[in-house]
Amino acid sequence: GIIYDRNGEVLAYNKLAYAITIEDVLSSGIDKSDKLNEIIYNTIKIIEENGDTINNDFSIIIGSNGKCEYSVTSDMAKLRFLRDIYGKSKIEELDTEKEQLSDNTAEEVFEYLVGKKRYDISEEYPKEDRLKIAIIRYNLSLNSFQKYISTTIASNVKDETVAAIYENQAMLKGVSRTMDIECIGY
């Protein structure tokens, strides 16, 4: 609702906002990963063509030199990120006699995520798009034991983006829009 001050001036109001979400609804199979990557790629393209951006709080970015780099500044934040990426329960488990995961560069983590061991993202996609697909796949994997929970790809998107998603619903299995209420304050 609308909140007024004692003089009748608007202090805050609610605004309808749309978000684009995805659920993993594909059946298991040999080409499931390729299909999911293609759905995510097509969704990203629609979102960006309409001037919106995907949600990205991932700790890897592509630097000006075209190489991946960490976006976190503290060593502890980097180690927590690596722990989560490699599925370890403790930071201490990153380093064993067999491997030293705590020393991995952002480029090595990127190659792990897009490689066959994890999300198998085709090199046909540009590097920046491969990273975006990996980010969304990683966020989807956080709900892998509760497949019915959707993952938000983009928030507060334009009506044009919502319309384009609906127009392409047949090729975007599992992708939908949700409505959120955004509180706007002065």
Residue ranges, per PLM feature:
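Membrane-proximal periplasmic segments of bacterial cell-envelope enzymes
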Residues: G1-Y186
